[in-house]
Amino acid sequence: MNTRIPPGPGAVPMPSRRLFVQGLAAGGVVAGIAAVGVPQRALAAATAAPRLAGAPAVLSDTRIELAIGESLANFTGRTRPAITVNGSLPAPILRWREGQTVDLFVRNTLERHPTSIHWHGILLPANMDGVPGLSFNGIGPGETYHYHFELKQSGTYWYHSHSMFQEQAGLYGALIIDPAEPAPYRHDREHVIMLSDWTDMDPGALFR
């Protein structure tokens, strides 16, 4: 028996089915459109990007340039600034093969804040791990950091910012390392699925 329990006082109303579907349709969408209620200074500071839909790009070169910046995102019908990589949310999928050596040039285009990328679960030298204050100083505004490392393992991982609440604001992506030897089985198609949540609030304010 299914019983519907009415929300208590002060409860946040659930979005309508229509709004939920609109949010799903916008998955991975970064929109450069103005919205009522968004401060004009925020709109001016954010990068005006075209509407992007579908899965993020897959980057598999061993030399890759990544630009961390601010774009406008709309998942719920409201627009707010997000932290993106190459204008994409989620960030591009990075896909390599075990045994390769990769060079990533990560440029910080944020005007006021440092940033970083941590390669979650990857075996790395300390100065390539990407944790500010622990393994390096972070990437200041206008700076570029050169990550250089050998891939000594295979598996499915992810990468994300370790600076402030940038991960919660959109700076995360999938990292796939295929084994050195081809898989002993066939498959028709492969899908990379990332689960995350989203808030229209400033993540820093949400965690206070």
Regions found by a protein language model. Give the residues of each.
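C-terminal segment of N-terminal export signals and the immediately downstream linker at the start
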Residues: 34-72
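Histidine- and aromatic-enriched segments that form or immediately flank copper-ligand environments
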Residues: 59-186
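Short, glycine/acidic-enriched capping/hinge loops at junctions between secondary-structure elements
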Residues: 3-4, 8, 76-80, 206
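RNA pseudouridine synthases
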Residues: 188-190
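N-terminal secretory signal peptides
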Residues: 1-16, 26
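N-terminal export leaders
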Residues: 16-35
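A short N-terminal beta->alpha junction/helix N-cap motif
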Residues: 12, 54, 91-94
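Acidic-aromatic/histidine active-site loop/patch
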Residues: 192-208
